[in-house]
């Protein structure tokens, strides 16, 4: 796996986060290279303020921080950690780390944007750029050419202003725009709905998974979550909007609740949803990489709906890390509940970790399976 990016007679050593042995995926892509080469051709004055949005593992921040002031905005805790680690690895100056809920710096010289997967997140980002920037500030986005649709460009036109694209290079394309549309379109970051028959109301911020309705996996596990008067606490790992925590909290009013996700918007959404649905409870919502820093043998129950993407890449290492971390953090006799697509084979992974006799199927249907693993 390649860890050295050499471009324009410079070399950076870059790693994904968390750093893993036998890593097969590199920390940058051709889109990063295309942006770097294009911006270098602009010959920006030194100490220009470059605002970078969605710098997945800090490649752009590392490159431009040597000569410029850099602010990196991302909804991803892991992207923040990766950026800091790669800056240190390459002995580069620190950058300002912001979330995409923070105001866009209004003194930017140029904005570089890795297009997000979610259109709701993109619309939110574009609306905030329009609000913060003057019309002469270039906004340059990048993505794989096949992911830049006419509908994508229409969103730029609607929320920013006139928009053009580059030629494709290594299957990537640049998008050029500026904040000229007048008047600016107001965008509400929140989207809400109710879930029957559970008397649950949910509010989602723009980058939260399944942003405008309840996903089928969550709906299935809601039917089976347990009420247990002896349950002292539980962790919702990869909590998203916190819907599983809300339901478990309804069923177990005595339990302390901890929600963990790597998305800052997910954590903010979960915090609001728990407060709105459960009132004053012992609740902690934490942006984190899985269960990093959680003490061993400290939790009675963990519920987990693992993602199988990291940024744009399909991978199962996040689920594996979640399962390993859960085993470490669970008390003896503690339970891990997992919901997943049947074809992902989580039962095999859990049997490897917990022992085959300690893993059982709680429920399944044609698409999903709910598994329980008990720590012995």
Curated annotation (Swiss-Prot):
A Pfam family it matches: MTS
EC number from the UniProt entry: 2.1.1.174
Presence of the UniProt keyword Transcription regulation in the record? no
**GO terms, molecular function:** 23S rRNA (guanine(1835)-N(2))-methyltransferase activity; nucleic acid binding; rRNA (guanine-N2-)-methyltransferase activity
Keywords annotated in UniProt: Cytoplasm, Methyltransferase, rRNA processing, S-adenosyl-L-methionine, Transferase
Tree of life domain? Bacteria
Catalytic reaction equation(s): guanosine(1835) in 23S rRNA + S-adenosyl-L-methionine = N(2)-methylguanosine(1835) in 23S rRNA + S-adenosyl-L-homocysteine + H(+)
Tell me where in or outside the cell this protein is found.
Cytoplasm
Q: What would be one Gene Ontology cellular-component term for the protein?
A: cytoplasm
A GO BP entry is: rRNA base methylation
The record's listing under InterPro entries reads: DNA_methylase_N6_adenine_CS, rRNA_m2G-MeTrfase_RlmG, RsmC/RlmG, SAM-dependent_MTases_sf, Small_mtfrase_dom
Identify the CDD domains for this entry: AdoMet_MTases (cd02440)
What this chain does, per the record?
Answer: Specifically methylates the guanine in position 1835 (m2G1835) of 23S rRNA.
UniProt cross-references to HAMAP family, sorted A to Z: 23SrRNA_methyltr_G
Q: Which family does it belong to?
A: Belongs to the methyltransferase superfamily. RlmG family.
Task: Kindly provide the name given to this protein in its UniProt entry.
Answer: Ribosomal RNA large subunit methyltransferase G
């Amino acid at each position: 796996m390649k860890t050295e990016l050499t471009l324009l007679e410079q070399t950076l050593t870059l790693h994904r986060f968390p750093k893993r042995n036998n890593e097969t995926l590199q920390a940058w892509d051709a889109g990063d290279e295309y942006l770097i080469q294009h911006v270098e051709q602009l010959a920006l004055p030194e100490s220009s303020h470059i605002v970078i949005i969605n710098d997945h593992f800090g490649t752009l921040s590392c490159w431009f921080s040597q000569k410029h002031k850099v602010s990196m905005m991302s909804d991803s805790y892991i992207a923040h950690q990766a950026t800091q680690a790669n800056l240190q690895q390459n002995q580069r100056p620190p950058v300002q780390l912001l979330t995409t809920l923070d105001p866009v710096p209004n003194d930017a010289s140029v904005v570089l944007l890795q297009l997000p997967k979610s259109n709701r997140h993109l619309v939110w980002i574009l609306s905030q750029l329009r609000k913060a920037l003057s019309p002469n500030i270039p906004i340059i986005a990048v993505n794989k050419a096949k992911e830049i649709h006419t509908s994508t460009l229409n969103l730029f036109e609607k929320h920013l202003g006139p928009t053009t694209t580059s030629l494709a290079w290594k299957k990537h394309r640049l998008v050029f725009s500026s904040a000229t549309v007048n008047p600016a379109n107001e965008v509400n970051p929140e989207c809400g709905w109710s879930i029957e028959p559970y008397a649950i109301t949910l509010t989602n911020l723009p980058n939260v998974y399944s942003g405008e309705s309840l996903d089928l996996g969550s709906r299935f596990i809601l039917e089976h979550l347990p009420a247990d008067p002896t349950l002292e606490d539980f962790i919702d790992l990869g909590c998203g909007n916190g819907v599983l925590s809300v339901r478990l909290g309804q069923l177990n009013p005595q339990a302390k609740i901890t929600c963990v996700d790597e998305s800052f918007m997910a954590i903010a959404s979960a915090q609001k949803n728990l407060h709105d649905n459960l009132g004053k409870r012992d609740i902690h919502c934490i942006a984190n990489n899985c269960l990093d820093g959680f003490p061993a043998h400290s939790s009675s129950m963990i519920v987990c709906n693992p993602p199988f993407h990291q940024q744009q890449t399909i991978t199962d290492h996040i689920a594996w890390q979640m399962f390993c971390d859960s085993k470490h953090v669970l008390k003896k006799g503690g339970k891990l509940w997992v919901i997943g697509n049947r074809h992902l084979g989580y039962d095999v992974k859990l049997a490897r970790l917990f022992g085959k006799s300690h893993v059982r199927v709680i429920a399944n249907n044609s698409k999903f399976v709910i598994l329980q693993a008990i720590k012995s």
